[in-house]
Swiss-Prot record:
Keyword Ligase found: no
Family statement: Belongs to the class-II pyridoxal-phosphate-dependent aminotransferase family. Histidinol-phosphate aminotransferase subfamily.
Keywords: Amino-acid biosynthesis, Aminotransferase, Histidine biosynthesis, Pyridoxal phosphate, Transferase
Source organism superkingdom: Bacteria
Listed name of the protein: Histidinol-phosphate aminotransferase
Assembly, per entry: Homodimer.
Presence of keyword Transferase: yes
GO MF annotations, alphabetized: histidinol-phosphate transaminase activity; pyridoxal phosphate binding
EC number(s) on file: 2.6.1.9
GO biological process: L-histidine biosynthetic process
Catalytic activity: L-histidinol phosphate + 2-oxoglutarate = 3-(imidazol-4-yl)-2-oxopropyl phosphate + L-glutamate
Organism of this sequence: Staphylococcus aureus (strain bovine RF122 / ET3-1)
């Protein structure tokens, strides 16, 4: 076994609603608001697409997901040779890390961001430099100070998980202009569709200026397909050619591909879902207590508090399962009735 695995632990999911009910003696319904899932679910057209192809389950998938690749190519106006799919972004991050990193290499990212950047670097015996957050968000200037000619990968998460904060187009443009052109900069935009900020980066446009800027997106969040695992990277043709060597030949299932195509085609449904999310998100920031909430451009809100366990249990007692972190609690934005319960708790909670 690799010795570096001793530095890591397997992913530990939160307790199930049933287990939480038993642990805390809770009666009534519990709502899972801990994993940033789209509670509205996927487009109805997704279910139609799945039903239409159930007779094909005994076939292997088409390697490389060509139907979905063509759809993404048209949707984003990028060449198909620049797109690579994974079974969720977890696998995409794994493939990139495996293809790029060798023992002793170095990646640079942030503290308090998506853990798979760190996890996969350690698996490959690489070194990890984690720059502290600044005002709850990525400190691009601080990260830039750690990047040099020998850096192997830079990971940026925008908006960031778990804080929900973002950096703007001007900041990313400036950052990319100062990174050595041979150093890959991976921009993880898993929550892109929820963003309403007008100055959010046009990363696809920046890719026209910077060959080392690579973009990650997923169908797990706004498109509501977390259970089907479809994510992708848009990168240079050369990078995709090399990373494709790492990709398992049948990594995205036939059903997942059909579902993702149907979801992508129903942009009206996506707009409805993201609009509902932005309306409900704004309600949290209307509270006087919102000074304790980091500004979010996602479908979740990070609530800062020193009394993490108390807030987690207070929300649990009104039926809402959230995600505790060392410095606060991450809350997935739910339906209005669920948010009403959380808003009442948050409006009466003592944060210090």
């Amino acid at each position: 076994m690799k010795e570096q695995l001793n530095q890591l632990s397997a992913y530990q999911p939160g307790l199930s609603p049933r287990a939480l009910k038993e642990k805390y003696g809770i009666e009534g319904d519990l709502y899972k608001l801990a994993s940033n899932e789209n509670l509205y679910g996927p487009s109805p057209k997704v279910k139609e697409a799945i039903s239409a192809h159930l007779d094909e389950l005994y076939y292997y998938p088409e390697t490389g997901s060509p139907t979905l690749k063509a759809a993404i190519s048209k949707h984003l106006n990028v060449d198909q040779s620049r797109i690579l799919f994974g079974a969720g972004l977890d696998e995409v991050i794994l493939m990139i890390s495996r293809a790029v990193l060798t023992p002793g290499d170095t990646i640079v990212t942030s503290e308090a961001t998506f853990g798979q950047y760190y996890h996969n670097a350690i698996v490959e015996s690489a070194n990890v430099i984690q720059v502290p957050l600044k005002d709850g968000g990525f400190d691009l200037e601080g990260i830039l100070k750690q990047v040099n000619e020998d850096t192997s990968l830079v990971w940026l998460c925008n908006p960031n998980n778990p804080t929900g904060t973002y950096f703007n187009h001007e900041s990313l443009d400036s950052f990319l202009s100062q990174v050595p052109p041979h150093v890959p900069v991976i921009i993880d935009e898993a929550y892109f569709e929820f963003v309403t900020a007008e100055d959010y980066p046009d990363t696809l446009a920046l890719q026209q200026k910077y060959d080392n800027a690579f973009l990650l997106r997923t169908f797990s969040k706004a498109y509501g397909l977390a259970g089907l695992r479809v994510g992708y990277v848009v990168a240079s043709e050369h990078a995709i050619e090399k990373w494709n060597i790492i990709r398992p030949p049948f990594n995205v299932t036939r059903i997942s591909e059909y579902a993702a195509v149907a979801a992508l085609e129903d942009q009206q449904y996506l707009k409805e879902v993201t609009h509902k999310n932005s309306v409900e998100r704004e309600r949290f920031y209307q509270l006087p207590q919102s000074k304790h909430f980091l500004p979010s451009q996602t479908n979740f809100i990070f609530v800062k508090t020193k009394r993490v366990n108390e807030l987690y249990e207070a929300l649990l007692n009104v039926g809402c399962i959230t995600r505790p972190f060392p410095t606060g609690v991450r809350i997935t934005i739910g339906f209005k009735e669920q948010n009403d319960k959380m808003l009442e708790v948050l409006s009466n909670f003592k944060y210090e």
